[in-house]
Amino acid sequence: MKSYQRWIWELPEWPSLVFDAHRIQPLLAAAKKSQGLILGKAEMIGLEGLQTHIRDSLTQEALTTSAIEGEKLDPESVRSSIARRLGLDTSGAPIREGQRNIEGLIDVLQDATLHTDAPLSLERLCNWHGALFPTGFSGMQRIDVGALRAVPMEIVSGAVGHHKVHYAAPSPEGLAVQVDAFLTWFNQTNPNTGSRPMEGLVRASLSHLWFETLHPFDDGNGRIGRAILQLALGQDMGQAGRIVTLSRQIESCKDQYYSELERAQRSKSMDVTAWVEWMLLQISQASEFASRTIDSAVQRIKFQAIMANVALSERQQKTMKKLLDAGPKGYIGGMTTRKHEQIAQTSTPTAARDLIQLEQLGLLKRQGEGRSTRYYPAIEGWAE
């Protein structure tokens, strides 16, 4: 009697994923158009002009790829750590206690987005895994770090005895062979250097599904799988790929992401067209967001040029830098007299006068009245 096939990897054709090239064409064309806009804008600004934007994008990627896993990181610590890696001014901002785990995650993201020419190897994957779990523990549980899992893996939800199995990964026996097949395919299909180059955005979609289906590590597969997404995107787009934050887009529709992933992994055939279509839509939306934030970066550059021609006190310069470093909508609650007082180490009356003057100079916009007064940079789209 033929055994019951539950997961896509149980099909005899696995891992030969296929898709309908004609059906995906409209979504692929839309994604490529959004991608082209980003490439054009990035070229206009130049790499130096993009540095701050790359910092903000990597910050978003780190925060959201962790949020998908239910882990909340401190935004200021993440931003400061990334700024240090990029050689940007951090004004001595420290990494706060309890946030040391962000360093490993940033190592992974930076390696994936910066070293796009390096082949993806088992050693590189294991190094990423080791960086994510430097203590050898995931929470209270000891795991095999920097090595493929040696135990069965299930994705479940619900209470013990009433749990639902969303997915069961391939057995650890033969897993090394399966991972090797994935890595060989990934490197051979590199759109620029591969012996069998493949359309970059479709390749990114397939690579994420394939890796998540293997689920080769005890923990951290989601974060590593999304790092592979960013690597594939960078190999397709070059440096501009560093500013498209797919984890932010996935986090915004997390439930649908897991639903689409589960549907693809339960497929009764190797046809994963629906998954590729869904991923192309997410890439389009992530690219459109990146395009808007590049526009914001251009506005910021122009704003800083205006600000450079205005005589500001050291106190005002400190506070304006704080606001600009936080990025669009990044300074939660806006600037208040009390916050400026603490930043500039000055008196309340002086702090109030400073902010009023910045508003009069056209550098800040005021929201609210009285105790509810908040100030934001006078850049379109920067206020909350």
Where are these regions (language model features)?
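FIC/Doc superfamily catalytic core
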Residues: 1-384
